[in-house]
Amino acid sequence: MSRKYFGTDGVRGKVGTFPITPDFAMRLGWAAGTVLASTGTKEVLIGKDTRISGYMLESAMEAGFSAAGVNVALIGPMPTPAVAYLASTFRADAGVVISASHNPFYDNGIKFFSNTGTKLNDAQELEIEALLEQALEHNALQCVASEKLGKVRRIDDAAGRYIEFCKGTFPNHLSLAGLKIVVDSAHGAAYHIAPNVYRELGAEVISINDKPNGVNINDHCGATHLDSLQSAVMIHEADLGIALDGDADRVMFVDHNGHVVDGDEILFILAQAAYQKGEMQGGVVGTLMSNLGLELALKGMDIPFVRAKVGDRYVVEQLKETGWQLGGEGSGHILSLKHASTGDGIVASLQVLKAVLESGKRLAELKAEMTKLPQVLINVRLTSGCADSILSKDSVKQAVIAAEEVLGNQGRVLLRKSGTEPLIRVMVESTDISLTQQQAEYIAQAVKVA
């Protein structure tokens, strides 16, 4: 059974347009509270990023949870992985994040974590959706008796607790003293956390894009827009730069030369560091979008590699199925189950810094030990029609077959719909950059006219 409201990363959309409305958020809070907090502490944590709409949706969710008899603990602007961690340590029944991650401020979303700090599975989301449908279609939101309504409280030391957790994933015998690091918080949820983590571990920190005003989150900054970080690293002659996205669940690096180090390269650096110390447990989980160069580099160390569906939730599922600990996506979602239950940009960055210090090499040198294959990704925005019907059209299928014949065994093609936006993503990868670009554009055009 397919999910109606939950995409690959919760519920997401444009603020003021269904389903990202106050009414929907209230009913979702009621349905989720009824399902997730039917036993246990009957309390949920709510965190958010810095979007102006977060206040509105937070209040609506509070009302829904209270109507279901569930208490709410507010932790304010907080990275998504912090909510996952704190939901577990506070013994809450669930954690709620109000964020649209790397999207612009006019989008927002709602996602849930279990009391173990993991994202909900498909069955749990379907159960919530079934109850939500009743509340939407039949106005069946049943408020508990007045004496059983949920209460709301604010937790003031949440940021400090999370900072200490992050620092605890970094070895005590190492220090960042002597490193100059530029940190780009994307005017997002980590603006008051990430710079302090690195400073408290000894680094000289230049903090940029750390002044959220409700509408500047991810605005030409952060992990999806690295130009300002690249410039800052060069201007300040820093050792490296670290970019987070709006909710700090993904991370990208810039080396001292101003060159980007993406999620695939981060996975390689972490896997190689573990391999060289004899600490590599199992293999690495990537996704269908992971660069073939990563797979080949890992193969050179006899490290197994498997591809999950795109989305960090599916990477986690594959990690648990295999019993492995390291996985992630090229976009910077890095999963290290040894340290955290979900993708954590700050924690992942600390593991990269550990690898840099222990190797005695610069980040650029570690990056250079993996050769990426040219990969072209074209996002085709849909103005009409649904992604599934377009992908099933013969003209699109024939374009893919033709491209695969041209590439032969020196490349691969992948088409997939976005789980969060009206897009079809066309990815082509091969050893020849001009051929890769040509075939990607050919397929993208077929999708546009389909």
From Swiss-Prot:
Task: List UniProt keywords, sorted A-Z.
Answer: Isomerase, Magnesium, Metal-binding, Phosphoprotein
Cofactor: bound how, per the entry note? Binds 1 Mg(2+) ion per subunit.
Q: Which domain of life is it from?
A: Bacteria
**Phosphoserine: which positions carry it?**
S101
| GO MF annotations, alphabetized | magnesium ion binding; phosphoglucosamine mutase activity; phosphomannomutase activity
Q: Where is the active site?
A: S101
Could you tell me the EC number(s) of this protein? 5.4.2.10
Spell out the GO cellular component terms annotated for this protein, sorted alphabetically and separated by semicolons: cytosol
Name what cofactor the protein needs.
Answer: Mg(2+)
InterPro entries recorded: A-D-PHexomutase_a/b/a-I (IPR005844), A-D-PHexomutase_a/b/a-I/II/III (IPR016055), A-D-PHexomutase_a/b/a-II (IPR005845), A-D-PHexomutase_a/b/a-III (IPR005846), A-D-PHexomutase_C (IPR005843), A-D-PHexomutase_C_sf (IPR036900), A-D-PHexomutase_CS (IPR016066), Alpha-D-phosphohexomutase_SF (IPR005841)
PTM annotation: Activated by phosphorylation.
Entry keyword annotation includes Hydrolase:
no
Catalytic reactions of this protein = alpha-D-glucosamine 1-phosphate = D-glucosamine 6-phosphate
Q: Where does Mg(2+) bind?
A: S101, D245, D247, D249
The answer to whether UniProt assigns keyword Metal-binding to this entry is: yes
Give the GO biological process terms. Answer: carbohydrate metabolic process; peptidoglycan biosynthetic process; UDP-N-acetylglucosamine biosynthetic process
The entry sums up its family as follows: Belongs to the phosphohexose mutase family.
Provide the function of this protein.
Catalyzes the conversion of glucosamine-6-phosphate to glucosamine-1-phosphate.
Q: What is this protein called?
A: Phosphoglucosamine mutase 2
Source organism (scientific name): Shewanella sp. (strain MR-4)
Tell me the gene name: glmM2
